[in-house]
Regions:
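Short N-terminal binding/cap micro-motifs at the start of the first secondary-structure element
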Residues: 14-22
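Short catalytic helix/loop segments, enriched in acidic residues and glycine
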Residues: 23-41
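Acidic, Ser/Pro/Thr-rich low-complexity regulatory regions
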Residues: 146-260
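Glycine-rich anion/phosphate-binding loops
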Residues: 76-96
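Internal, conserved structured core segments that host functional sites
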Residues: 89-167
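Short beta-strand segments
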Residues: 10-11, 44, 101-106
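Extreme N-terminal starter segment of soluble prokaryotic enzymes
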Residues: 2-7
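Short, surface-exposed acidic-centric catalytic microdomains
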Residues: 31, 45-66
Length: 260
């Protein structure tokens, strides 16, 4: 039996009172509903580097050279960039079995996008930053489903995230337990119409690549490329138009057996 998928999660979203103000941002959908089907692995990067609760707020600061640093908001000379970077890199080794990650929006450590970045004079800059921990996460595991808590309120993005988590979980199980060309082809056969629902171009691109599986001497290298392609296609939410196209394909399979 395949175990439940493991999803990493910012500790505050799991309900732990680890935020700078001593509070939390418990994500009800995750902790009340999705928790039945997955195993969450919480982490608070800011506490992991030794910061207390409560603590002064942190912010991202862009230097005149363009480098991003993490500093305390009350004193930008108090820099914790190196500590956060060192922890983030070391923690990646603990995430080899995860199938997804949910991070806290707007956080200088965990934000996935649109995190406020200040200049060296303390002026509010553009919302174009990524939290230091999440930046390392997405760079190390580019194929991993990563979402912010706020975006999961959108039913389309929520469905897409959960779908990707379970697809990657099944693929990872195949890799660990029974990786072979036959099993990988069987996996693709099960998922190809699902890929079509997400991207017609991606579906067509995968065809020749899958057909060439026997030309690869190193199956593990092939698997890594296949995984990247699969997850890139699934990252694009399925559309009504593509769902209709999938149904037309399915109808074609049965057309010879159906009366007019």
């Amino acid at each position: 039996m395949i175990k439940k998928p493991v999803i990493g999660i910012s500790g505050c979203l799991a309900g732990s009172a680890v935020r700078f103000d001593g509070g939390h941002k418990r994500a009800d959908f995750l902790m009340d509903k999705l928790v039945e089907w997955v195993t969450f692995r919480p982490v608070c990067p800011e506490m992991a580097i030794g910061l207390p609760v409560p603590r002064p707020a942190l912010r991202l600061v862009r230097s005149t050279q363009g480098n991003i640093r993490m500093c305390f908001s009350y004193d930008q000379n108090e820099d914790v960039t190196e500590r956060m970077t060192e922890f983030s890199r070391s923690y990646m080794d603990k995430l080899k079995d995860v199938s997804g990650f949910v991070v806290c929006a707007k956080s200088p450590s965990c934000g996935m996008e649109r995190v406020r970045v200040y200049d060296e004079n303390g002026n509010r800059g553009r919302k174009d930053g990524v939290g230091l921990f999440t930046s390392t996460l997405m760079e190390k595991f580019s194929w991993l489903p990563v979402e912010e808590d706020g975006r999961l309120h959108d039913p389309v993005l929520r469905e897409n995230f959960v779908e990707r988590v379970f697809a990657l979980h099944e693929l990872n199980h195949l890799y660990k337990e029974k990786l072979s060309r036959r099993e990988l082809l069987a996996f693709h056969s099960r998922y190809k119409l699902q890929l079509l629902a997400h991207s017609q171009a991606g579906y067509k691109d995968m065809g020749p690549f899958v057909a060439a599986i026997h030309e690869w001497a190193d199956l593990e290298s092939y698997f890594e490329v296949y995984r990247d392609k699969l997850m890139a296609i699934l990252r694009k939410p399925a559309s009504r138009k593509n769902h209709t196209n999938v149904l037309m394909h399915i109808q074609g399979y049965f057309s010879n057996y159906l009366s007019t």
